[in-house]
């Protein structure tokens, strides 16, 4: 209600540009659609600059009034490409519409891939979420086996990808195991071309890095502390088992807090079962922040 009054006040002022800062972040989903409607209704005669990290609002605005906005990615990090970076129509389409993203992965992406193996690994978490969505448990389980650092199984990612998307764009056979992912050199990844899909290119590099870090932490902790993964298969369980809660062991507490607090080790950065938005993690963290967190995690693992 209070936001509606603020929008009504904004409608009455003589200024043509209205700035809204993350208008739906603190609201339940039941109100989000109403807020999007109110923004369009009250501010239809003005220009609006809406700042948000929530793609739900972007989708709601698009569905209520098609092609009503230009989308930008805002960045302000030393050493990076900064300012308001326009998201082109190609990426706007696949960000807003899951069917367009699936269509891209089944055909158009073929001309953009620079490294097939890296592409397949980077998209593995999304593939698993897609399998969960369409209830293909066999392929979901096969992907799960290569997404945990302590596992030894391997799977043919080429055939799995082609079968899932009913395509033949992956030409070479890539049989991948967890050890293959852990052995990958992740500095200076180049997965797809950046001219047509720059945000997707960034996203896939991030996705690969998140997966690599999670798996590396799992592998190190399971091996070093001889953890039985039968009942401790998830990363948070492994961390708690490696560093059990003890008032007498402050080092354990520090290590546990360190790993549990790292953003890139959260499930949300690797799991798409509840949200098929492949872009959200990459929108939430800058390249520099990811690089710093990667260095911190690997340094901590090396000190154990």
Task: Annotate the PLM regions.
Residues 58-68:
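Short regulatory helix/loop adjacent to the ATP-binding pocket of P-loop NTPases
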Residues 1-19, 33-42:
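GG-anchored amphipathic helix commonly corresponding to the ABC/SMC/Rad50 NBD signature/C-loop
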Residues 47-53:
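Structural recognition of the conserved hydrophobic beta-strand(s) that form the central parallel beta-sheet
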Residues 26-29, 33:
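Conserved D-loop-proximal element of ABC-family nucleotide-binding domains
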Residues 53-56, 77:
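Acidic/histidine-rich catalytic neighborhood
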Residues 14-15, 44-46, 66-70:
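Short glycine-/polar-rich loops that comprise or flank the Walker A/P-loop
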Residues 64, 75-304:
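Acidic, Mg2+-coordinating catalytic modules of nucleic-acid enzymes
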């Amino acid at each position: 209600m209070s936001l509606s009054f603020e929008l009504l006040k904004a409608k009455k002022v003589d200024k043509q540009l209205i700035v809204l800062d993350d208008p739906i972040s603190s609201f339940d989903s039941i109100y989000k659609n109403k807020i999007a409607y109110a923004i369009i209704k009250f501010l239809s005669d003005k220009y609006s600059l809406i700042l948000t990290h929530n793609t739900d609002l972007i989708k709601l605005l698009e569905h209520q009034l098609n092609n009503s906005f230009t989308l930008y990615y805002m960045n302000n990090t030393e050493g990076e490409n900064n300012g308001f970076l326009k998201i082109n129509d190609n990426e706007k389409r696949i960000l807003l519409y899951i069917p367009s993203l699936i269509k891209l992965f089944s055909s158009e992406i073929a001309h953009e891939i620079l490294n097939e193996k890296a592409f397949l690994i980077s998209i593995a978490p999304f593939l698993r979420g897609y399998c969960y969505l369409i209830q293909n448990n066999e392929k979901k389980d096969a992907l799960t086996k290569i997404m945990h650092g302590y596992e030894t199984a391997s799977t043919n990612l080429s055939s799995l990808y082609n079968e899932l998307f009913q395509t033949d764009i992956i030409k070479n056979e890539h049989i991948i195991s967890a050890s293959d992912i852990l052995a990958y050199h992740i500095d200076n990844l180049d997965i797809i071309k950046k001219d047509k899909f720059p945000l997707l290119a960034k996203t896939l590099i991030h996705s690969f890095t998140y997966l690599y870090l999670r798996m590396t932490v799992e592998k190190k902790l399971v091996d070093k502390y001889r953890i039985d993964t039968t009942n401790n298969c998830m990363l948070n369980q492994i961390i708690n088992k490696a560093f059990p809660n003890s008032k007498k062991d402050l080092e354990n507490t520090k290590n546990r807090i360190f790993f549990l607090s790292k953003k890139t080790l959260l499930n949300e950065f690797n799991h798409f079962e509840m949200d098929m938005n492949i872009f959200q993690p990459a929108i939430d963290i800058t390249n520099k922040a990811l690089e710093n967190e990667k260095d911190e995690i690997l340094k901590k693992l090396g000190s154990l």
